[in-house]
Amino acid sequence: MKKLMVIGCLITGLLAVGLVKEAPAKPTRNILIAGGRTTSPWYPLSQGLARFINQKSDWLRAEVVSTAGITGNLDIAKEKPKDYIGVDSFAHIHYRPGHPWGEKRGTYTGMRFIANVSSETQCLITYDSGIKKVQDLAGKTVDVGRKGAANTVDHMAVLEKYGVLDKVKLVYTGYGGGADKLKDGLVDATMMMFDHIYPDKFTKGGFIENLETKGPIYYIGFDRDTLLQLRDSEYATVPVWVPARAMDPNTQPQALWAYDIPTFYIADERMDEDTVYEITRIIWETPADEWAKWHPIGAHMNETFKPAMPSLKLYKAHPGAKKFYDEHGIELKDLADLLH
């Protein structure tokens, strides 16, 4: 009887061992990250993301691909939705139906939020200390973005909202061209980006520092309600509070409202949930100081700002990202609520 019991136990043990074999390893999955131009801040941050994925995932592998620009990022994610994620811009809200910019290119609504990346905070600047508000630009020459660029739509919408679009002469060159034309005296004011690490670390950046070799630069701000109204109407204008003297102790004595066209990681809605969950996990678990090694602006890739969306009303999170955030009790936030 004892022998039978021993044999029975051995058989049961062997069967149990067979039943608790390790689950087969998840097949390796390769993705590409559309990183834009190599000179853009989101390109090195995307290189960082690829490195983090390759180091921290047991089954996911990533490689960064340069594109013609941030619009190229979205285009390739749209064309190859199961292979690419990318860095998107809030300005691509104009891809939506009903927007002339998107209608010309072919509308697209499949992008889904994963995590916040970087700022593109801006206001109007001038050498003319007499121009103190947007309405003072009437009769002046103003540089906005390049013709055909998505952010130009937002620049013109701001001028229209303040009632001066039909009262100014427009020049279309973008930020670098606008800086050159302002310095050469060919325009009176230009839209200009400056460096911004969330929530409130501001520096002038190279364009403004170069302009100051000619003379002091003055800053023309907006107001929060107007920017929020524009955002609700599907323009890329996230309000940003710039405290007094944050840009310059002499030429910016008063606080002002600028606006941000944030960038963020996206995947097409057709990208599988498991892959995006894993990407989101790695983004979340990688601390800000690791991101900042790839670009200084990565310093705001922290738990406050990673889940901050350009608009909770206008965007959806990818199901894989939302699953990760929900499982870990992480609330998706409106970026505008964090920048005032």
What are these regions (language model features)?
Residues F194-K214, Y219, R231, D274-H340:
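An extracytoplasmic/periplasmic, membrane-proximal ligand-sensing/linker region
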Residues T107-T121, L211-G215, W257-D260:
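Short Pro/Gly-enriched coil loops immediately N-terminal to beta-strands
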